[in-house]
UniProtKB/Swiss-Prot annotation:
Keywords: Cell cycle, Cell division, Cell inner membrane, Cell membrane, Membrane, Transmembrane, Transmembrane helix
PROSITE patterns assigned: POTRA (PS51779)
Subunit structure: Part of a complex composed of FtsB, FtsL and FtsQ.
Naturally occurring in which organism (per UniProt): Hahella chejuensis (strain KCTC 2396)
Subcellular compartments: Cell inner membrane
InterPro entries per the UniProt record, alphabetical: Cell_div_FtsQ/DivIB_C (IPR005548), FtsQ (IPR026579), FtsQ_C_sf (IPR045335), POTRA (IPR034746), POTRA_FtsQ_type (IPR013685)
Gene: ftsQ
Topology versus the membrane: Single-pass type II membrane protein
A GO-annotated cellular component: cell division site
Protein name in UniProt: Cell division protein FtsQ
Membrane-spanning intervals of the chain: 49-69
A GO BP annotation: cell septum assembly
Residue ranges of domain POTRA in the record: 75-144
Residue ranges, Cytoplasmic side: 1-48
Amino acid sequence: MTPMKKQLDKSLGSRRGATATRAKERADNRNTGPAAIVRLLAFIPWNRVLLHVSIFCFWLLVLSALIAGVKWLDRPVATVQVVGELNYVSRGEVKELLSPLLHASFFTSDLEGVRKSLEAHPWVKRASISRLWPDAVQVDLEEEEPFVRWRNQGYINEAGRLFVKETGVVVNGLPALIGPPHSERLVFDNFQKWKAELAKVGLDVNGVIMESRGAWLISFTDGWELNLGKQDVEGRLHRFTVLFEKKLHQEREKIASVDARYTRGVAVKWKADVTPEQG
């Protein structure tokens, strides 16, 4: 082959290579360029896409409306109404305990927490709180009713529970019970039992004392006391009731005190200057 022919073949080969390269580039451009994107978009189910987008937007609007509605409905609490007669709990104390409710959220205010705070007050027996549309709260309070006084400053309810040990509240006209610390239940039970037993002979018990050494004294509305001591208390009480019903009830207004710490009788101290008798 002549040198000229070799040069010609080489030139033709270079042209064919360049042409193939340009063809490949054009093919690549068709697969990755704007035309390829147009072809890809043609395969997307636009009707379905638009349907799903519309549904999503609809529920988004519904949710936004609900949130806005709840915010509009959830007004701050403007009024707190207290229902129930208050004899022992001051209005100031109740107002302070209810202060977390004022201007709080109507729906999310902590009613249970406030209820527990109210019932933690010694004079509050029961509390209930309810919402009143649109911006009020109603509080129902039931106070403890003192049945007897304990150690001058405390009070026991009718169920025998010492609900307050010390208080500045003074309730007049209640029976008075006194005893060592933690003896309130025993003293209360004996008071109830002896009050019922002595009422059968016309005596009204208005106080019971349990001394630290274990001795018992009963006081009556007539103004005198019965000393039962600490031994055979029930037996001594029975002997006294029999004697009182038979003999002493006619002279009850003259009695200053009765000592039942005897085996076979009692010693009576009279209000007048009379020597005590045994019977």
